[in-house]
């Protein structure tokens, strides 16, 4: 999972201009709940979350609320972000106490297969992946 941001404020702060792009995120949250494949906190002006592929989010059997997870989770105060063209098998997104200015476009299973296929490490860096 990827977590970006800090705090619970809708006010502009040092978090911002982040790029979460073309990641392949899977098989996560096996020992936790209240999470997302991509999870954000606080206002992050100029942040773009795009062209990621996320699947296999599965809270552990002990989780108090097994439905409290999302592929993309904009939590407390998340504001001024663009979330677009992210592939996941279902449209399961969480928006909790968000601030203004978030733009959601074209996220879910209808996103191009090309985006899903191109996500993750580029060919020249794939040797870094644990086998």
Regions found by a protein language model. Give the residues of each.
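Extracellular beta-strand/beta-solenoid scaffold signature
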Residues: 1-10, 32-41, 64-74
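Right-handed parallel beta-helix
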Residues: 1, 14-29, 45-60, 79-90, ...
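Surface beta-loop-beta hairpin patches that serve as ligand-binding interfaces in beta-rich domains
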Residues: 103-131
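Intrinsic disorder/low-complexity signal
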Residues: 74-75, 84, 130
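Active-site proximal loops enriched in glycine and acidic residues that flank catalytic Cys/His/Asp
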Residues: 4-6, 36, 42, 76, ...
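Short flexible/disordered coil segments
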Residues: 57-74, 91-96
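Residue-identity detector for threonine
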Residues: 9, 27-30, 35, 40, ...
């Amino acid at each position: 999972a990827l977590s970006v941001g800090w705090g619970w404020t809708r006010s502009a702060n040092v978090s911002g201009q982040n790029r979460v792009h073309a990641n392949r995120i899977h098989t996560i949250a096996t020992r936790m709940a209240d999470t997302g494949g991509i999870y954000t906190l606080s206002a992050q002006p100029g942040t773009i979350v795009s062209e990621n592929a996320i699947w296999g989010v599965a809270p552990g059997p002990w989780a108090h609320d097994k439905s409290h997870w999302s592929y993309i989770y904009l939590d407390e105060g998340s504001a001024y972000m663009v979330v677009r063209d992210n592939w996941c098998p279902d449209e399961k997104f969480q928006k909790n106490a968000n601030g203004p200015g978030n733009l959601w476009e074209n996220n879910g299973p209808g996103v191009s297969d090309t985006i899903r296929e191109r996500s993750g490490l580029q060919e020249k860096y794939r040797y870094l992946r644990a086998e």
